[in-house]
Amino acid sequence: MPKRILQGTVVSDKNDKTVVVRVERRFAHPILQKTVRRSKKYKAHDESNQFKVGDLVSIEECAPISKDKRWTVVSAQS
């Protein structure tokens, strides 16, 4: 099974080697028939502490690193 890759924005970099990335998804509401925005936050591994708040990044699924971390930052988006 291929690893999932998501794009999002770094919202916190206060932890060592960890960033919190907010990933937004859009979908059509089944009853209201309008586009709805929902977001979810993922903790991702950042080995070199190079990503800062506001950066657009890609995260990739990986084996569990800690209790909450199952994603790693792959690259920055431009």
From Swiss-Prot:
rRNA-binding listed as a keyword: yes
SUPFAM superfamilies the UniProt entry points to: Nucleic acid-binding proteins
One Pfam family cited in the UniProt record for this chain: Ribosomal_S17
GO CC annotations, alphabetized: cytosolic small ribosomal subunit
Keywords: Ribonucleoprotein, Ribosomal protein, RNA-binding, rRNA-binding
InterPro entries: NA-bd_OB-fold, Ribosomal_uS17, Ribosomal_uS17_bact/chlr
One biological process term in Gene Ontology: translation
CDD domains: Ribosomal_uS17
GO molecular function: rRNA binding; structural constituent of ribosome
Domain of life: Bacteria
Family under the similarity heading: Belongs to the universal ribosomal protein uS17 family.
Subunit structure: Part of the 30S ribosomal subunit.
Protein function: One of the primary rRNA binding proteins, it binds specifically to the 5'-end of 16S ribosomal RNA.
UniProt-recorded name of the protein: Small ribosomal subunit protein uS17
Organism: Sinorhizobium medicae (strain WSM419)
